[in-house]
Amino acid sequence: HHDGFCLWPSTKSTHTVAKSPWKDGKGDVVRELSDACREAGLKFGVYLSPWDRNHKDYGKPEYIAYYRSQLRELLTQYGPIQEVWFDGANGEGPNGKRQVYDWPRVFGLVRRLQPGAVMFSDAGPDVRWIGNETGSAGDPNWSTVDPAAVPYPGAEGERVTAMLQHGD
């Protein structure tokens, strides 16, 4: 899910359904899903991976503007969005590049364009990750996270791990 392929016809990328043979390049998976959710009375949410292994500027300051422009497309073209899901992917691995995303500006963009949406990540700011890939919460697990300890998605360290497992 970090390959950068856009399931909507993004104007910011050529790595998108618009350049694929699916529906002769006229398809939009995100549109179909958002419409289906509304028809079924379900609330709609989106995920946009911050780590795009396909983009040439990943790891450079220019990438941040690109990422936010894609997020802006998702937040403005599909009606009300209930949840925006983020993870802290920072180019892990021996060939990865670490990217600083400026999360406060990303969170601000969501608040401005979709004020009713909740944001999920390991750092919140609204709903936080349980702290592991198994979905098993530690015991006890309080619902709060100290923003100073987990200031952004992808923050690392023993205190971060403990807080995600048990709360503050």
Each model region followed by its residue ranges:
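Mature catalytic domains of secreted/periplasmic carbohydrate-active enzymes
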Residues: 1-168
